[in-house]
Amino acid sequence: MSTVGELACSYAVMILEDEGIAITADKIATLVKAAGVSIESYWPMLFAKMAEKRNVTDLIMNVGAGGGGGAPVAAAAPAAGGGAAAAPAAEEKKKDEPAEESDGDLGFGLFD
């Protein structure tokens, strides 16, 4: 049930922010109630406190910015160790891949 409460309050905060209305616990609770969702009473207060401390628009705009932390580190390591060693490893992987099987007759013909 808590994930429903979090989701409903998140949507309510985004609606209030989009409309330029001040985000309060009462307004969040009113929107959630109008949507017909029953949540625990502490969710609106938690989301209202979060909205006081954070700029909601910045949070929405930076949703995809935090997910790429691991990839640049992994990509930087081979570059520092020498690019010549990385190229043969990629060629070996291509050789090890099994050939794709054909879609030959497997006995499941629809119109047989």
UniProtKB/Swiss-Prot annotation:
Keywords recorded for this protein, A-Z: Phosphoprotein, Ribonucleoprotein, Ribosomal protein
GO cellular component: cytosol; cytosolic ribosome; ribonucleoprotein complex
Keyword check for Ribonucleoprotein: yes
Modification type Phosphoserine: residues: S102
Any single biological process term in GO: translational elongation
Region (Disordered): 85-112
Transmembrane helix as UniProt keyword: no
Gene Ontology MF, one: structural constituent of ribosome
Record text on subunit structure and interactions: P1 and P2 exist as dimers at the large ribosomal subunit.
Function: Plays an important role in the elongation step of protein synthesis.
Family classification: Belongs to the eukaryotic ribosomal protein P1/P2 family.
Protein name: Large ribosomal subunit protein P1w
